[in-house]
Amino acid sequence: MKQHLKNTFLLLPIAASLPVQAQDKNESPNLVFIMADQWRGDALGCLDKEPVQTPHLDQLASEGVLFTNAVSCYPVSSPARGILMSGMYPMNNKVIGNCNSDTAPYGVELPETARCWSDVLKDKNYRTGYIGKWHLDSPYKPYVDTYNNRGETAWNEWCPPERRHGFDFWVAYGTYDNHLNPMYWETAAPRDSFFYAHKWGPEYEVDRAIEFLSEQKKSSS
């Protein structure tokens, strides 16, 4: 008998391929979203425009739908993610630029009151998880002690549970570009209790995603 994950949703904001099992007709589908941060639209092997090799993404394109004439209305990290999460333009969701200490005085961060599709899924009793870069909260003093908060502009910030828009499981950071040794906050970790993975970021995040999906499969069997 086939075993299905029950009402599971995972957002993985990195480039990786993860299988989602088919659902019976009357069941809610399992969902895995994969979001790449500021990925050039033509940096895909299947488009033959750059000397890149992306076999897993090419497979996703061949087995699904590939848009070749689409644009982002604001192609930098925070605004693009804010648009995808909320379905609103930056002027409506308040994320009109990257979240950092320079834009913080202007309220540039995703409001807790914004209604995201992850909130909707949570209301539908999905078990939700987020792994990777979030970058939708403004840093505030005293800044978190990471390398990218020690210069003139602070960038990195913890996201408290009430601002996670329905995500139960959380292994994420604000923004942090040392991908050879990335840092994260776990679900229940307070602001001052982040950890370093000591591993290539995308590899670590895929491992945690597979672990999350496996646990959901076991709990629903």
Regions found by a protein language model. Name each.
Residues 1-9:
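Bacterial N-terminal signal peptides that target proteins for export
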Residues 12-16:
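Repetitive helical segments and hydrophobic/amphipathic motifs
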Residues 8-9, 20-221:
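Formylglycine-dependent sulfatase
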Residues 1, 18-20:
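Intrinsic low-complexity/disordered segments
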